[in-house]
Amino acid sequence: MRYYLGVDWADQTHAVWVVDESGTKITARAVAHTAEGLGEWGRELDEWRAQGIDLWAAIERPDGRVVDFLLDHGVVVYPVNPKALDRARDRFRQSGAKSDPFDARVLADFLRTDHAHLRALLPSSEAAQELKLLTEDCQRHIRQQTRLVNQLTATLKAYYPRALEVAEVTSALAREFLPAYPTPAAVTALTERQWQRWARAHGLSAARAGDLWAVLRQPHLPVPAHVVRAKARLMQALMEQLMPVVAAVAQYRKAIDDFFARMPAARWARTLPIGKHGITAPTLWARLGDAPGRWESFRHLQAHAGAVPVTKRSGKQQVVHFRFACDKALRHVVDQVAFLSLLSSAWARAYYDQQRARGHSHRQALRALGAKWLKIIFVMWQRQVPYDEQYHLATMTRQQLPQGQTQFA
């Protein structure tokens, strides 16, 4: 016997609907997202399993505390795309009305009737899950850093563009220079002796100090005094926000690099021609996971990463368009792999150049190269083997294919 659970998750209360194999309602309940609420629900799940009942659950997310809770209690979890749920609602209600219990009911019945078209969640190891969380949090900090850098750059351009020629706004020099000389007037009032003294105190060479002094003595953009006062205050506020984020990004990068170095997968993932350090290889492996059988084929992986287009056929018409529905984080890191490989892999460079010669844009050529890399990465992931450039080139030679049309056997 099997029960199908529909779980409409929320921050405070989860709606749950349970049906049997015939679609008959077993129970419906609201589960509070508290220790008591989850504990009571867990005991009910354990009782059903003790009676020999298989439990399958449909939920609109592949991770999170509720998903972990269900897995801990032996429930087979099926993540459901929100778009699929939206279309399934029409089976039960054409008015467009919805509620949390109704969505839970739709999820339960959708899983009962359409589970052959869904894939059960195959959770990775705890170490792989931790690495994934670390890389996701690092990317959030990087996005926050980028936002603040853009704001700070725009602010300096508005009243003090010369400061942008002194140093990158995320650098240690900028961290010291901007608070010390927050306005063009502060720099104009400097003597060369004062500047040289400040430069020596902050570790600048005599040559570098001389170059910067020449920059600072150039005429500054004429800006009204009230604009300078307002923008200088904003600059200081942005610097106070930016510097801790810059430090956090550096700490996350080191933590990820150190954490991944202790994992067995580092032995093969680090062999890709993308540099032996940094967070690209750890992020790639974190998105792949280590659950056996998660990826059925390299084509499955390519589609999940958005590296191959979508083809729509109807009668004599055929339309090929960009694949929007995919793992955006995986697509981003595959683009990074493709870009970094241009510096170290001869065949990758040749393939990219061939794509550009055909009139494809940089992004299109990079995406096509990423699709090629995913064929190789799938084999590396599946067999847990390192990348061997010479083996790959020999494979191309055996197949008598030009480097721009390479395949990995």
Labelled PLM ranges:
Residues 1-409:
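A detector of single, family-specific signature residues
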